[in-house]
Design a protein with these regions (language model features):
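Extracellular zinc-dependent metalloprotease catalytic-domain scaffold
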Residues: 1-204, 210-260
Length: 260
């Protein structure tokens, strides 16, 4: 079970949620024709292609179209800022982190992970070409990863599950995720989540699934979140041996800066 630690400053009792990753049964599609071309630089793909020891500027974009509609549909409007601001702050954190010199394994999704990590439903054609491919793969957007938000019920995600996420489409040449979905549980009582740090730590964890980090290092929240009681407030940042070896100081500085 994936345990979520709460901020004691905001909540008197500990709330425990699961990550619904194991409930996602399907797999992503390998894109053989995906070439992210920058509007002003047609050679951008060559710069973005991952090398074993090269620099890599990673650009992330969230399509809020669907999640905005569902926030209204499921009467979650009063929590909209929690969702939107949480996603945006996590993206800024990841983009800052991923501009440092990285190792190839941080983004490479193995064949095993492709089978286990994915969520695209070939039978129901969930989202299908109309949503996941609406120009993203051929237009000159100059983006590396597009993330799509969606709400599911507890019966679909699992009881006590707060969120789940995975890559939908993966570039066949680089094994780089190019489109992913974050699922949020529409049945959760979000009034219990009073801390933005609390929610952002969840989204940060889910984004690691889309990026394809080794599942062994991101299985439990309390494995990847280190508590810092400075000034009497609990704060969290990613702590993975594979990430820390590359960007420990930058990572800590970025996360703590964002959460201040």
């Amino acid at each position: 079970m994936l345990t979520l630690l709460t901020n004691k400053t905001y909540e008197k009792e500990r709330i425990v949620y699961k990550c619904g990753q194991n409930n996602l049964k399907t797999k992503p599609q390998l894109l053989t024709n995906y070439i992210p071309i920058d509007k002003n630089n047609k050679n951008a793909y060559n710069k973005r292609k991952l090398d074993s020891d090269g620099f890599h500027d990673f650009s992330i974009y969230i399509d809020y179209t669907n999640i905005n509609l569902e926030i209204t549909r499921y009467r979650l409007t009063k929590y909209k800022s929690l969702f939107i601001n949480g996603f945006n702050r996590v993206i800024s954190t990841l983009e800052s982190l991923l501009k440092v010199k990285t190792l190839n394994y941080a983004y490479t999704i193995s064949n095993r992970q492709i089978q286990e990590l994915g969520i695209y439903n070939w039978d129901t054609k969930l989202f299908g070409d109309s949503a996941a491919k609406r120009g993203y793969n051929t237009d000159s957007l100059g983006l590396d990863l597009i993330i799509f938000g969606k709400f599911l019920s507890s019966s679909e995600l699992g009881e006590s599950t707060l969120a789940a996420a995975a890559a939908e489409y993966v570039d066949v040449d680089t094994q780089q995720p190019v489109f992913g979905i974050v699922y949020l549980n529409k049945d959760v009582d979000y009034s219990l989540i009073n801390s933005k740090e609390y929610f952002e730590s969840i989204i940060l964890h889910e984004f690691t699934h889309i990026l394809g980090f080794d599942i062994n290092y991101f299985l439990y929240f309390n494995y990847i979140l280190i508590q810092n009681d400075k000034f009497g407030i609990q704060r969290y940042y990613i702590n993975s041996p594979r990430v820390v070896n590359v960007a420990k100081n930058i990572l800590i500085a970025i996360i703590l800066l964002v959460l201040n």
